[in-house]
């Protein structure tokens, strides 16, 4: 399901499972001399409950998120994402600010022209690549403000940051869709290009419920949306936030996100504020400074330290492939990679990263 149904009998099983994890984890940690715990995730009940109990007992907890080789959880930062609210303060202390911004500018411009960098290596194709339907119009061009909503995958961790205005992505969508008619805008929706297949049924149901809302093809190039003169972009915490802002587009976020320390996008703190800006787009006043976006980009994707090592942010970008379970040769290929010493530096890299966070 894309959101919680309090009448769903499966919810009871989830709660029982969570309680089982809680009491089992607590008993084990209280009766064994555990010093450190390594988790693949810091969210979802099978990981987050164990991690939080461990932290309450003074046990070190580590995760391996996308942005860092190693991330160390703390009681005041339980999520797997970097401490992005400190980005500005950290950057201010750097001596080569201009060089760092130059580095960001090159990579960011390459991304916006269709290249996939290591920061978005999870994308199968670039969302800014030119497509075969480039002559088709995105907006109706009816004189109304042009607004695009970028959907998230409904099943992909809506709570990886500290908080969000809505309980989940589905409630955000319902909130916006139910107000589109009153907004009186030229409105389009783009599904997430990497969304899980289960999203398709949800989207079809939304189309039936809101027949007047126009959905784009999920592979529509973001470049085309920008070129048609979009006035406002809606996202909860997506990378499109800083990418569209770099083109001077106003962006309305709906939750804590990596750009929260900066002022090039707008983040309301309540549903009431969010609704106000939806209904009054002309009241959104932003001073978008490209250098701020370049600074953010450097801190989020390129900066060394706090669990990130030299060589950018993805240690395992040695040989990018889709991990398809039907590919029976996948593990043989990994063994072949190891035989030519492609992974020899992995343990040294982890040691360096752990030293940084400890």
Model-derived regions, located:
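Conserved nucleotide-sugar donor-binding subdomain of glycosyltransferases
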Residues: 1-36, 109-126
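Donor nucleotide-activated moiety binding/catalytic core segment of transferases
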Residues: 13-30, 141-142, 168, 195-242
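Conserved nucleotide-sugar donor-interacting segment of glycosyltransferase catalytic cores
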Residues: 21-76
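Gly/Ser/Thr-rich loops at beta-strand to alpha-helix junctions
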Residues: 40-47, 194-197, 241
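A donor-sugar binding/catalytic signature common to diverse glycosyltransferases
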Residues: 46, 219-266
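Active-site-proximal region of nucleotide-activated glycan assembly enzymes
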Residues: 52-128, 273, 280-285
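Conserved catalytic-core segment of nucleotide-activated headgroup transferases in glycan assembly
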Residues: 113-205
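Long, C-terminal catalytic modules of enzymes
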Residues: 143, 264, 268-358
């Amino acid at each position: 399901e894309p959101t919680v149904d309090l009448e769903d009998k499966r919810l009871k099983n989830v709660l029982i499972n969570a309680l089982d994890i809680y009491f089992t984890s607590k008993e084990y940690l209280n009766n064994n001399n555990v010093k450190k715990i390594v988790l693949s995730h810091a969210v979802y009940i099978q990981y987050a409950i164990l991690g939080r109990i461990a932290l309450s007992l003074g046990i070190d907890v580590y995760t391996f998120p996308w942005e860092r080789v190693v991330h160390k959880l703390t009681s005041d930062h339980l999520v797997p994402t970097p401490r992005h609210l400190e980005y500005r303060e950290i950057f201010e202390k750097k001596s080569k600010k201009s060089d760092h911004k130059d580095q960001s500018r090159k990579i960011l411009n390459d991304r916006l022209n269709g290249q996939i960098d290591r920061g978005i290596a999870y994308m199968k194709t670039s969302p800014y690549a030119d497509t075969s339907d480039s002559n088709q119009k995105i907006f109706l061009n009816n004189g109304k403000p042009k607004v695009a909503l970028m959907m998230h995958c409904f099943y992909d961790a809506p709570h990886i940051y500290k908080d969000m205005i809505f309980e989940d992505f589905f409630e955000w969508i319902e909130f916006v869709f139910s107000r589109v008619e009153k907004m009186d805008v030229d409105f389009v929706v783009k599904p997430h290009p990497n969304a899980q297949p289960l999203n398709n049924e949800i989207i079809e149901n939304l189309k039936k419920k809101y027949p007047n809302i126009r959905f784009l093809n999920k592979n529509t190039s973001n470049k085309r949306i920008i070129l048609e003169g979009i006035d406002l972009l809606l996202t909860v915490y997506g990378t499109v936030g800083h990418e569209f802002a770099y083109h001077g587009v106003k962006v309305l976020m709906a939750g804590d996100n990596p750009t929260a320390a900066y002022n090039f996008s707008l983040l309301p703190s309540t549903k009431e504020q969010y609704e106000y800006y939806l209904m009054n787009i002309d009241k959104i006043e932003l001073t978008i400074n490209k250098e701020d976006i370049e600074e953010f980009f450097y801190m989020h994707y390129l900066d060394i330290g706090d669990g990130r090592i030299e060589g950018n942010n993805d240690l395992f970008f040695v040989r990018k492939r889709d991990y398809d379970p039907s590919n029976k040769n996948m593990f043989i290929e990994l063994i072949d990679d190891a035989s030519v010493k492609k992974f020899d530096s992995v343990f040294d890299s982890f040691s360096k990263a752990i030293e940084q966070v400890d």
